[in-house]
Amino acid sequence: MSPQTETKASVGFKAGVKDYKLTYYTPEYETKDTDILAAFRVTPQLGVPPEEAGAAVAAESSTGTWTTVWTDGLTSLDRYKGRCYHIEPVPGDPDQYICYVAYPLDLFEEGSVTNMFTSIVGNVFGFKALRALRLEDLRIPPAYVKTFQGPPHGIQVERDKLNKYGRPLLGCTIKPKLGLSAKNYGRACYECLRGGLDFTKDDENVNSQPFMRWRDRFVFCAEAIYKAQAETGEIKGHYLNATAGTCEEMIKRAVFAKELGVPIVMHDYLTGGFTANTTLSHYCRDNGLLLHIHRAMHAVIDRQKNHGMHFRVLAKALRMSGGDHIHSGTVVGKLEGEREITLGFVDLLRDDFIEKDRSRGIFFTQDWVSMPGVIPVASGGIHVWHMPALTEIFGDDSVLQFGGGTLGHPWGNAPGAAANRVALEACVQARNEGRDLAREGNEIIKAACKWSAELAAACEIWKEIKFDTFKAMDTL
């Protein structure tokens, strides 16, 4: 099929094209603790053997090119090349294979997710010999993890800053996401925070548009935060989206947020880019700001089962680049998210050490060597009837975010927020008493309705709303 290179200068230069597998398929290779390991789902073109396809991925994402070049003799390819060291068929699909590739750590710049992805998921994804290619998982070695700052603060520091423990946090995305004036936007934030939510949020595409410039929004939202805090005695926050067209403008917005004294800012990390995200994360740690991350554009990359990159890889990359929250799907809402897969990458976000578990899509054991964790955010098509399931699935270290499920309440924003707070506290109390939320959830919510008119009204309006018509695209 395609190229390859001799690995030792002593062999001498011999021009021509060789099969990749002659050099890059090494089933005898024993992986090192310092290697970055990748699991690719490979769909070769007809007639291309899986060994050649896996070797091609290893070559084109590391040191290889389409033909032998004389400059190979000026370095040690054995030291720097990627190696396809194991291939296994995908059960139920004879045309697909999981190819495992090991990359020497020296191929990557320290502390740069940008450089890591440029190599591993760069040009190789357009390679003609492959019909499709998907990066399913990465093992990041501790030696490389330690070159990253990671989240600005992490789960425990955030709880200490907010003085909130023993329950999930509650949020709300302000709707309509576009079109409100800054003052009306701030009013909606205030009503939600006063009603019992911990956070309100800019939607991902709220930046600085003609109908609402960023500085005006920041000021009115800060006013809403301080007024709600004074009335409730609780610390409140609003995710002020600092995403901008340049890194300089992004940091300017974060600086203004800090000057206002608010606790948290936000970034769209995929559309904004990993370099921008890491820059903002470093600023947030240095200046005491929490950082909420939205994953806008992720489904372009991760939704197709045979091509792209799984979200668990994007989640690991975010933990390295830096963020205190990230949207992770809901399992029960309107957006894509199969339960076991979601729980797999939720653990990768929060826990310090995660064992290999193929039943949840985790291909490698991952040791984060005490890097702070990231709080998963469940958001998208959820309402009070989902509260028992969300509490059971995500546990305490999560943010449950109800946009339409707050602002769509028949009595208004503050009653909508109150309904969510009552439902959450009822579920947490029931769980702490040993009740089974999965089995008794509806009864728990109905019982709470007896002493909360706001919750009763919310339950009535959304009693028929479900999003289980469509099956998840990405399954194990």
From Swiss-Prot:
Its EC number is 4.1.1.39. The modification N6-carboxylysine is found at K201. It is found in: Plastid, Chloroplast. Signal peptide: none annotated. Its cofactor is Mg(2+). The record marks K334 as: Transition state stabilizer. The modification N6,N6,N6-trimethyllysine is found at K14. GO terms for molecular function: magnesium ion binding; monooxygenase activity; ribulose-bisphosphate carboxylase activity. It catalyses: 2 (2R)-3-phosphoglycerate + 2 H(+) = D-ribulose 1,5-bisphosphate + CO2 + H2O; D-ribulose 1,5-bisphosphate + O2 = 2-phosphoglycolate + (2R)-3-phosphoglycerate + 2 H(+). The active site is at K175 (proton acceptor), H294 (proton acceptor). Binds 1 Mg(2+) ion per subunit. Mg(2+) binds at K201, D203, E204. RuBisCO catalyzes two reactions: the carboxylation of D-ribulose 1,5-bisphosphate, the primary event in carbon dioxide fixation, as well as the oxidative fragmentation of the pentose substrate in the photorespiration process. Both reactions occur simultaneously and in competition at the same active site. NCBIfam families: PRK04208.1. Heterohexadecamer of 8 large chains and 8 small chains; disulfide-linked. The disulfide link is formed within the large subunit homodimers. This is Ribulose bisphosphate carboxylase large chain. It comes from Sorghum bicolor (Sorghum). The lineage of its organism: Eukaryota, Viridiplantae, Streptophyta, Embryophyta, Tracheophyta. The gene is rbcL.
